[in-house]
Every structure is written in structure tokens, then in C-alpha cells.
């Protein structure tokens, strides 16, 4: 039995059902463990309460920061394959190219990721 954590959301139900079907077709029993937010799911993953976490980029960063050992991404939805990222800087900023970010701290995430 694989315990897969996810954040409970009506918009995620179709994805949850699709993942459950995918696992069952491969002979893997799946137990969904739903959380009210990404922080709770990250803590559960680090504690070993769930085997996998279904989250976005910021959820990954949260888990990676909490873990003392590396974690890895093992799957991505096909709808995310062609995603692009845009970096936007103020016109009066000294940032003109990605190289200008060297030595700076910044964060980004998708609008659907907490």
C-alpha cells in the first residue's frame, strides 16, 4: 500500500481519481491521505507518515528544506512539461539578465502552488 499525500481541494479531485486509476492498473494499492495545506503535508512526508507527496514547486522546496537527506522528483504531469517561467524585474532594477541574479536570493512558484 502506497500512502500518497495531497492537499484536499475540489479542483484536485479529477487528478486524484486519475492517479488512483494509474496506480491500480499497475497493481499498486493507493491510500490517499488528504491535508488542509501544503505545510501539513510537508511535515507528514518528513515524519514518514506518507510515502509520496503530490505538490507543486513550493511544496517541493518546503519538503527539501525540512529533510536532512535529499528527496527527488519521480514524476510530472504531462500538462506541466511545456511550462515556462518568466522572470520580471522592475525597469529601474540593476537586474537585466539571469546572470545578474548571481549572489542574490529570490523565490518563485506557480500561481496554483502554495
Protein language model annotation of sequence segments:
Residues 40, 59-60:
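Alpha-helix capping/helix-boundary segments
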Amino acid at each position: 500500500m502506497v500512502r500518497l499525500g495531497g492537499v484536499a481541494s475540489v479542483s484536485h479531485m479529477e487528478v486524484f481519481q486519475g492517479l488512483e486509476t494509474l496506480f491500480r492498473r499497475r497493481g499498486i494499492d493507493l491510500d490517499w491521505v488528504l491535508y488542509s495545506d501544503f505545510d501539513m503535508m510537508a511535515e507528514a512526508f518528513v515524519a514518514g507518515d506518507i510515502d509520496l507527496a503530490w505538490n507543486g514547486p513550493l511544496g517541493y522546496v518546503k519538503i527539501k528544506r525540512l529533510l536532512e537527506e535529499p528527496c527527488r522528483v519521480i514524476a510530472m504531469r504531462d500538462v506541466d512539461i511545456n511550462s515556462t517561467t518568466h522572470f520580471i524585474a522592475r525597469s529601474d532594477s540593476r537586474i537585466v539578465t539571469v546572470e545578474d541574479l548571481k549572489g542574490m536570493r529570490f523565490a518563485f512558484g506557480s500561481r496554483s502552488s502554495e
